Amino acid sequence: MSQSSASSIFTVSRLNQTVRELLEREMGQIWLTAEISNFSQPASGHWYFTLKDDRAQVRCAMFRNSNRRTTFRPQNGQQVLVRASITLYEPRGDYQLIAESMQPAGDGLLQQQFEQLKQQLAAEGLFDQSHKQPLPHPAKQVGVITSASGAALHDVLHVLQRRDPSLPVIIYPTSVQGVDAPLQIVRAIQLANLRAECDVLIVGRGGGSLEDLWSFNDERVARAIFNSHIPIVSAVGHETDVTIADFVADLRAPTPSAAAELVSRNQIELVRQIQGQQQRMEMAMDYYLAQRNQQFTRLEHRLQQQHPHLRLARQQTLLLKLQRRLEESAQTQIRLLSKRTERLQQRLQQVQPQGQIHRYNQRVQQQEYRLRQAVERQLNGYRQRFGIACSQLEAVSPLATLARGYSVTQTPAGALLKTTKQVQAGDKLTTRLQDGWVESEITQVTVAKKSRQKKVVTQ
């Protein structure tokens, strides 16, 4: 035997290992439809069974971490769809399958078609978020594409009536189950887009089996939803049901009732928000008015402080105080002189210088007379100055000017009217007189020739 021939000789272990590696590398995972037989579940929790058809069979194992995700318990004689890897059990040389997932045969084929269509449409970009249209807020009119006799329509209408009774609803009745259902759903979507009555559409139905919901896994329905110019909310089955329509739609709702919640406004909450905003507006208005009232009060106080009558009264009070002080000072001086005179008289009486006393007495009387005259002149001077000051204040007082026959006229904007350029025919003026106000309206404006100014004629 040559050296090359010797190197190609296998042991049984090496042969089984090589075959196992070849099967696992070349075959990978496969989908297999078959009938279950010899099903068993030992204490380990693993499943062991045989998959067969009418001409062959193969052993299969499904370990506990995989069979835990299966939604049914397999039965002998049941047709199933299995996704499995091919391997070889080296100790016995038996090739077998290691199952990863299992479904009843009918559902399994549909699920396989679902996955294939999902991958195809995803590759084309139909599920991309960039194609999703935003829902209108709020919706002005809602369209519902579903069965006219189904529970889904009743649920949608009930929620819309409860949340937003004023929201108009248009129903596009269609079959949602059966061979003709996909085409009818497509036509309903196209009709809604053609009529353009609604600004959002709810497309869906109530719950059911995978076969019942299969119309919403149809490629034609998916493309119709994608091509719709009106935003579409899918609402197919229950929350656990997922269809191709859910991936293509602009928004997926777990149930038809949830879809109605998404497209409608909660009128009670809206009223509550409006009431809250109204209350905040009233509080802001009250605060604004209070601020303006305080500002007006301060301005009124300042104006009152600057009024000519008040200023004149303050000056008059000051002059009266000065007059009282002057009179008190004069009286004090007179009392002092009188006391001094009395003391002098007492001293003179003691020495009895009659002639000197007579002369001093005359001098005192003269000084007293001159003092009284000086005090009187000074008081008259103060009175005269006080009268002049009062006259001057009265002369500059606006009320005195009005009393002499003058008036003050204001424009509609509140400005003083100084020139005819400030007014025009039809304007209303307010004129302040000594004893009140006069409202007048300009009927004609004439420009004087000498001064080139307008003459205002009012009525």
Curated annotation (Swiss-Prot):
<keyword id="KW-0378">Hydrolase</keyword>
<dbReference type="InterPro" id="IPR003753">
    <property type="entry name" value="Exonuc_VII_L"/>
</dbReference>
<dbReference type="GO" id="GO:0009318">
    <property type="term" value="C:exodeoxyribonuclease VII complex"/>
</dbReference>
<comment type="function">
    <text>Bidirectionally degrades single-stranded DNA into large acid-insoluble oligonucleotides, which are then degraded further into small acid-soluble oligonucleotides.</text>
</comment>
<comment type="subunit">
    <text>Heterooligomer composed of large and small subunits.</text>
</comment>
<dbReference type="Pfam" id="PF13742">
    <property type="entry name" value="tRNA_anti_2"/>
</dbReference>
<dbReference type="InterPro" id="IPR020579">
    <property type="entry name" value="Exonuc_VII_lsu_C"/>
</dbReference>
<keyword id="KW-0540">Nuclease</keyword>
<dbReference type="InterPro" id="IPR025824">
    <property type="entry name" value="OB-fold_nuc-bd_dom"/>
</dbReference>
<comment type="similarity">
    <text>Belongs to the XseA family.</text>
</comment>
<keyword id="KW-0963">Cytoplasm</keyword>
<keyword id="KW-0269">Exonuclease</keyword>
<protein>
    <recommendedName>
        <fullName>Exodeoxyribonuclease 7 large subunit</fullName>
        <ecNumber>3.1.11.6</ecNumber>
    </recommendedName>
</protein>
<dbReference type="GO" id="GO:0003676">
    <property type="term" value="F:nucleic acid binding"/>
</dbReference>
<dbReference type="Pfam" id="PF02601">
    <property type="entry name" value="Exonuc_VII_L"/>
</dbReference>
<dbReference type="GO" id="GO:0005737">
    <property type="term" value="C:cytoplasm"/>
</dbReference>
<dbReference type="GO" id="GO:0006308">
    <property type="term" value="P:DNA catabolic process"/>
</dbReference>
<dbReference type="GO" id="GO:0008855">
    <property type="term" value="F:exodeoxyribonuclease VII activity"/>
</dbReference>
